[in-house]
């Protein structure tokens, strides 16, 4: 038993005493007081304000409503996009549609005895010819004749043939758009004839004579414009002959 007691005393031997325990307790209390004082000082210090740019501080205060942002008139007045938008041409002018030019060419066709200014065909205009082709098909439809396909088909083939003939006959070449523009504008008298077919039949002496007059009117106007635009003096009859054949086909559609 004495050996066992000696073993226990040797096994549990330590340098720890009651004085050391009291000293460690005092150290922990001092550390707690120091931590609490630092926490209290940190709580008493004011929090740093959020960062605000100098531009926002210098700008004027907002006076509008929440969902209605204040407009900056200086930005819109100095914006280059507003000025460029105001300087843009109208939409019809960008598309190449000029009603004064259309009216001038229409008057030239309606008065074949008037001298023709060749410069009117320097600008290729297809707005008037398309309108007259649609008007011819519409008047034939109102007269009980559905001939839209024939009108468009003969117009395209006739323009190709006369374009080839004029390039062979003239020293200066001519564009396909110019030929289509002239032939389309000169289709206006044929539209008048098809409009008359809506009210009375043209299958008679009066209808045949009226058709001959309209064919001569269309071919004379077209040949005069081609001669003036291409400087083909002395060749008007040679140009008027294929034009008369083309407009004769349109007259046959109108009568029958």
UniProtKB/Swiss-Prot annotation:
Keyword match tRNA processing: no
Cytoplasmic side: 1-125, 169-172, 218-235
Keyword presence, Transmembrane: yes
Keywords: Endoplasmic reticulum, Golgi apparatus, Membrane, Transmembrane, Transmembrane helix
UniProt topology in membrane: Multi-pass membrane protein
Cell compartments where the protein resides: Endoplasmic reticulum membrane; Golgi apparatus, cis-Golgi network membrane; Golgi apparatus, trans-Golgi network membrane
Region (Disordered): 18-48
GO biological process, one term: endoplasmic reticulum to Golgi vesicle-mediated transport
Family of the protein in this entry: Belongs to the YIP1 family.
Protein name, UniProt field: Protein YIPF7
Organism: Homo sapiens
Lineage, highest ranks first: Eukaryota, Metazoa, Chordata, Craniata, Vertebrata
């Amino acid at each position: 038993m004495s050996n066992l007691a000696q073993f226990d005393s040797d096994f549990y031997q330590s340098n720890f005493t009651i004085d050391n325990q009291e000293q460690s307790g005092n150290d922990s209390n001092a550390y707690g007081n120091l931590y609490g004082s630092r926490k209290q000082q940190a709580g008493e210090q004011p929090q740093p304000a959020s960062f605000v740019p100098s531009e926002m501080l210098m700008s004027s205060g907002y006076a509008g409503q929440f969902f209605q942002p204040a407009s900056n008139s200086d930005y819109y007045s100095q914006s280059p996009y507003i000025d460029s938008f105001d300087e843009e041409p109208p939409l019809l002018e960008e598309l190449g549609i000029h009603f004064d030019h259309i009216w001038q060419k229409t008057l030239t066709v309606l008065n074949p005895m008037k001298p023709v200014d060749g410069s009117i065909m320097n600008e290729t205009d297809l707005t008037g010819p398309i309108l007259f082709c649609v008007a011819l098909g519409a008047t034939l439809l109102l007269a009980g004749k559905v001939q839209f396909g024939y009108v468009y088909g003969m117009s395209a083939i006739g323009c190709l043939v006369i374009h080839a003939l004029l390039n062979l006959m003239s020293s200066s070449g001519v564009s396909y758009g110019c030929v289509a523009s002239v032939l389309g504008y000169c289709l206006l008298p044929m539209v008048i004839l098809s409009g008359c077919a809506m009210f009375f039949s043209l299958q008679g002496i009066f209808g045949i004579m009226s058709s001959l007059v309209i064919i001569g009117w269309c071919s004379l106007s077209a040949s005069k414009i081609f001669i003036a635009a291409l400087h083909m003096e002395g060749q008007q009859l040679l140009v008027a002959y294929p034009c008369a054949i083309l407009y004769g086909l349109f007259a046959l559609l109108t009568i029958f």
